[in-house]
Amino acid sequence: MTNQLEGKIAVVTGGSQGIGRAIAECMVNSGAKVIVGDKNPIESTNLHWHLLDVTNENSVKEFAKQTIDNHGPVNILVNNAGIMTNSPLIEQSVEEWDQVMAVNLRGPFLMAKHLVPLMDISQSPAIINIGSIEGISGNPNHSAYMASKAGVHGLTASMAIDLGPKGIRVNAIAPGWINTELNQGYLDGVPDQEAAQKELVKLHPIGHIGKPSDVGDTAVWLASAQSRFVTGQVIKVEGGRMSQLSLPSIFNKEH
């Protein structure tokens, strides 16, 4: 355990499971007091929870009030709450599209709008938005998700410019394939999971799939003084997946 975030108060949206839960736990282990904002209650002895619907402005306002009243000024905001759909473009409903945009893009906007005025500027606050490598490159049937995450990356740059003069740093993390409950759900639908796992590993030059704590540790760094001159960036946490150009197997040679 390190104390990089000792005395800091952090908010993590969508922190009941997966990457969000890992970020929350990594920050607690680094000395922060962490408030999880989520629709779903959490069972934890070291995390605090308040009800939050990031798509609803009144809910965000109430969450901000509860956080300040019960815990004090926020130093760190992690906009992690997100959803994904898996629909071909022409089959995707407008309602489905709007819901993805509401959670993934409207949510970070509303959280920043109502939490930034309540931040403790003297403590070098930081905002971390969770994007995705799918906001940079393409995958089939994920048009709403990809568009929303590209929007998160753009929002991050704009927020960094707007909030920099206030002393607030803003960065995004773009995770690749991380071993979460959500991604395991995709694997559960594959007949040969062992073969699928091997193929996934091949996509990563580093030789293994990421863990939620890999993203959590990156978030701790971005929230800490060690990254004090880093802002407006999208940090890819993807094991080198986007660094390699895959060629057909006929080009592979054994040495």
Regions found by a protein language model. Name each.
Residues 88-89, 96-101, 200:
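Substrate-binding pocket helix/loop in short-chain dehydrogenase/reductase
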Residues 90, 137-144, 165-166, 207, ...:
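Active-site loop immediately N-terminal to the catalytic Tyr-X3-Lys motif
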Residues 112, 148, 156:
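Active-site helix of classical SDR
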Residues 117, 161-165, 228:
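Alpha-helical segment proximal to the catalytic Tyr-Lys
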Residues 132:
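Residue(s) in the substrate-gating loop at a strand-loop-helix junction
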Residues 172, 194-226, 230, 237-239:
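C-terminal helical subdomain
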Residues 231-255:
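Short C-terminal tail/terminal secondary-structure segment
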